[in-house]
Amino acid sequence: MADVAARLGISKMTVSRALSRTDRRSRSTSEALRQRILRTCHEMGYVIDQTARTFSSKQSGIVAALIPALNNSNFSDTAHGLSAALEARGLHVLLGYTDYDLATEERLIRAMLSRRPEAIVVTGGHHTPGARTLLRAAGIPVVETWDMLAEPVEHTVGFSNAEAVGALVRALHGKGYRNIAFLGGVPES
């Protein structure tokens, strides 16, 4: 930041104010000066220190998300959709991969929360007691996905596999089918 300020002959504080301004209505610097600062930052390859910004603003601009598998198109599609929706709102996803392991999920929740995310999205509703404690104490929005939970930590976005299969079996039974089987994969242990 000091190099940008020196090149433009302005104070570091002016550069800081221009870079931290996220709203056009905020006029701590003129728009013309802000554009000069942004151009100079781009020319010099200056990258904003998000750690410092998080410290001063108390906003990280990230949403933590934990998924069980990267090689499952359902979860990779979820991560892609979440990323696209958040990006449109100026937020970024910090993605963790649990490999269907609850102890790994708890470790990742602790690690993600240490980054001070704006929210955390976890897959499923089965968590260790320690993970549930961390999520409840986080002080940020918690979203559990892919299940309809009787006792969610906070928010749930999902569906009930049991209800969906029940509806399917009832429909098939209603059409006269009696020998019904289900074949499905299970995560490797």
Regions found by a protein language model. Give the residues of each.
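N-terminal helix-turn-helix DNA-binding module of bacterial transcription factors
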Residues: 1-58
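Proline-glycine-enriched beta-turn/loop adjacent to the NAD(P) cofactor-binding site
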Residues: 13, 68, 185
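Short, basic/glycine-rich phosphate-binding loops at helix/coil junctions
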Residues: 17, 31, 146, 179-181
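Alpha-helical recognition/docking segments in bacterial nutrient-uptake
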Residues: 57-174, 188
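Conserved beta-strand segments that form the floor/walls of ligand-binding pockets within enzyme
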Residues: 158, 181-182
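Secondary-structure junction motif
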Residues: 182-189
